[in-house]
Amino acid sequence: MREETVSWKYFKRDVVPFTAMIAIECTTVGSSILYKAATLRGFSFYVFVFYAYVGATLVLLLLSLIFGRSRSLPTAKSSLFFKIFLLALLGLTSRVAGCKGIEYSSPTLSSAISNLTPAFTFILAIFFRMEQVMLRSSATQAKIIGTIVSISGALVIVLYKGPKLLVAASFTSFESSWIIGGLLLGLQFLLLSVWFILQTHIMEIYPEEIAVVFCYNLCATLISGTVCLLVEKDLNSWQLKPGFSLASVIYSGLFDTSLGSVIHTWGLHVKGPVYISLFKPLSIAIAVAMAAIFLGDTLHLGSVIGSVILSFGFYTVIWGKAREDSTKTVSDSEQSLLLPSHDREED
């Protein structure tokens, strides 16, 4: 009985989060692949973003009714609702930049550039004075070096293609604009880093994962719907035809935007941000395989070299963050041990 209890705890603590994080990376890449396939057939990315948010909002509404707690949602006049609205505006802008970036380049480039997120977050944390820069600290040195290496790797991917390593059967004559796509994807993950900082602040004052994600998607739906009405005046572009267009919207709304966000937030609570981040470079390999199979993308030497450099910088930043967190934990525990003895001396 005791062995079964230990096995169940191990399964729940380690196996479930591990499997969930791999599934999330596959889901994210799969959404990018389907979206790319849909846009190659003329599907408007504004319409895609709007319908994806609509689908996510409906799914999260159902989840909030089933699993939601009795705590009331923030009112439209509250400062919390304004922050969630700002979060939606940031998320929507980031997503539009990302969709356009994938349209100009490829899902593989998107997966590679996504590894810049920790470096961007570190830079923004310094800018907003949320991060203390101690140049003599090994943790700070690792984060600085990792940030520089990550950005260098991203530049290699964007600016240098090199010879072809894997030539797949191309299903389209679409000519990509690699540099423009790389810049847009860089903007996407820069905005996403700001999004993470604001989301962390919101979760501290309102720790309701499903409610926050639901309100976020609802606001994003309203904003994207307004933008879509202004940009896409041809009503025919709003039609969801059977095929990649419909599949990309359903897949993104059901799995990526809604359930993916909830599982990602759950993973942050269960295992922490460092553990979640360790799986990001895995998306590069997944994207290379899926893009070659389903889109006929060609793999270049520059993408491989840049991805290796970027992944090294990524893990260096993560190591520095983990080192900093462990140092803080040891320091706090030492202080908690010293305080009682100090009190006894005064008595």
From Swiss-Prot:
Residues 30-158, 216-317 form the EamA domain. Disulfide bonds: none annotated. It is found in: Membrane. The chain crosses the membrane at residues 15-35, 47-67, 73-93, 108-128, 139-159, 178-198, 210-230, 243-263, 276-296, 299-319. The keyword Transmembrane applies. SUPFAM superfamilies: Multidrug resistance efflux transporter EmrE. Belongs to the drug/metabolite transporter (DMT) superfamily. Plant drug/metabolite exporter (P-DME) (TC 2.A.7.4) family. This is WAT1-related protein At4g15540. It comes from Arabidopsis thaliana (Mouse-ear cress).
